[in-house]
Amino acid sequence: MDGAPVDHHAQSGTEHAEQRLAEARELLRQSQAEAERLRHQLQSAQRHAAGLSERRRAAEAQTQTAARNNRRMVELLEATRAEIATLKENLDAVTHPPFTFATLEAVHAPREPEEGVETGAVVRGGADVVQNGRRLRVTVSPLLDAARLTPGAQVLLDESSSIVGVAPGTGSGQLLRVKEALPDGGLVLAGTADEERVVRRAPALEGVELRHGDAVTVDARVEWALRRVELSEVDEVLLEEVPDVTFEDIGGLGPQIDRIREAVEIPFLHPEVYREHGLRAPKGIMLYGPPGTGKTMLAKAVANALSARSADGERSFFLNVKGPELLNKYVGETERQIRVIFDRAREKADAGFPVVIFFDEMESLFRTRGSGVSSDVETTIVPQLLTEIDGVEALENVIVIGASNREDMIDPAVLRPGRLDVKIRVDRPDAAGAAEIMAKHLTADVPLHADDVAAAGSADAARGTLIARTVAALYDRGAGTALAELTDVSGTTHALHLADLVSGAVVADVVDRAKRHAVRDYLAAGQAPAALGVREGHLREAVAAVLEDQTDLLATVAPAEWARTSGWRGPRLRSLRMVRGVEA
């Protein structure tokens, strides 16, 4: 048997089987390890699921708790709301009329008390009011928004002195004049009998520019200026404007215009030339002469010329003072208004604007001192004007112009050199001047009747013919235009014709009457084109109407009075006898 051959084939199969067995064992071992790992993962997942389930149960419990708390909060809020409504009803029931009126001074927010100086009750918040002259610190009703309470307002206090409402303001109070505005915002006010007081501004006046002479209402209990009052007393007599009248708009006053330009335009527009020659600009101009001769228009043209010819192109201001309306029965009021007028002029002049102060009807304000019959108001008004005019010396852009047809009544101190330096007589126009004035009113824009245009050959020729014939009718010294016979103290008689009473205003009135007559005839003709326009007959009719008006006026006036107001320059008159309208 030892020598029997080995079966190699069987041996190889055994080794192969053992190898496969080992691989199977290894695979089994790996499977068991994988199974163990999966078992551990399963256990971990089961534990995580258990944790999630526990958290879910806890969340459900918290949700249920929150729902219970929410229900309790809703119930509590409803109960609180009902309690607040009840408290408001009780508070409204407690605060019932009557209420007391008071003026609110200030509102205080709560703050920490200063130890050793004030107690907690002082700084809890509240408001300061003035009631019947007493200053009180009161509480503000919790139903009010304290931030909306404005100092100076009228408030209502209940029986416990708590502010329960705001009352509408009355706007009334003592009326005082501003004398000076202080740097800290306070105001120095002037009252009656030279009384002065310093007051604070109410919130409504914060930032408002107040000038000297402005009127304000004052609550004397709190010493506050409440509001500015726009009084018309000064504005009615003072027209602050920039005139649009030029010298070219004025006819028949060539010599007077030349004198005004020499006296005003040159020193105001070329002050350096005047200074080089040792001259100063005139402080004022006096325009005098009969009524209706263009004195006011000249003053307006001066203001316009100062602005139109200024090197800087700045505008000017024309302060037109209506003299009679400036007079006031209260002592010192007229003087105060004169100061206000010059203060306004200084404001504009300080800003670099040329200013013209024009006093119309100057004799009504500044008549000769001591000439009054029932009172001597001029004894204080005239010195006030003289003081203001002398004060104008330091200003470069102010000139005073006075106009009057009774220059004999004005105080001589006003007219002396150094005050109203330049005196210009504005006399009645002659025939050439009247034609020039009429051309300013009967312009190319005014329609002329077709018959007159056809007869003259052109509209311009017809206009010239109408003006020439109308002026000839006005200045005719025949028997038909004689109005009265004047006798002077020497016994000399003078025939008074319509030509002696013609003024720029009369010429303008003639043209206006003719225009109205033309409109009347045009409408009466059913607005037929052939009836349109002014014709010679309308102008002659207007001259006749003016002649009748002058006749009626002369028949009712005394000779001496007529001589003073009409510009009569002959001897003193003794009598005036009407020759027109007197039946034989």
UniProtKB/Swiss-Prot annotation:
ATP binds at G292, T293, G294, K295, T296, M297. The keyword RNA-binding does not apply. InterPro entries: AAA+_ATPase, AAA_ATPase_domain, ATPase_AAA_core, ATPase_AAA_CS, NA-bd_OB-fold, P-loop_NTPase, Prot_ATP_ID_OB_2nd, Prot_ATP_ID_OB_N. One of its GO terms (cellular component) is proteasome complex. GO terms for biological process: modification-dependent protein catabolic process; proteasomal protein catabolic process. Residues 10-96 form a coiled coil. Residues 40-66 are annotated as: Disordered. GO terms for molecular function: ATP binding; ATP hydrolysis activity. Keywords: ATP-binding, Coiled coil, Nucleotide-binding. The keyword tRNA-binding does not apply. Belongs to the AAA ATPase family. Homohexamer. Assembles into a hexameric ring structure. This is AAA ATPase forming ring-shaped complexes.
